[in-house]
Amino acid sequence: MKDRKILNEILSNTINELNLNDKKANIKIKIKPLKRKIASISLTNKTIYINKNILPYLSDEEIRFILAHELLHLKYGKYHINEFEEELLFLFPNKEAILINLINKLHQKK
């Protein structure tokens, strides 16, 4: 399992990259089993949930991608509007490869 300190460092760095510092103090990470998702965010209580069953197999870059994705929901809302996708692609030019790896890991751990 990834050390909570590492997760919080990646979260803090990603918050800075996305210029979400005004929301930084309120964002929490919770690790729990999720049936069909790698991660999700509650926009109401600003909590990112990461799938406990997949977390040990994720690289730091994959965790950064997941956190950025969820934080962009906090920034832009529930839907993947153009600005959401453009900002994610700017941070991760290899976005498609990361997504393929994450989907493969999700299916392997079911």
Swiss-Prot record:
UniProt-listed InterPro entries: Peptidase_M56 (IPR008756)
Residue intervals passing through the bilayer: none
The name this protein goes by in its record: Uncharacterized protein MJ1213
Coiled coil: none
Entry similarity comment: To M.jannaschii MJ0123 and A.aeolicus AA15.
Gene3D superfamilies found in the cross-reference section: Metalloproteases ('zincins'), catalytic domain
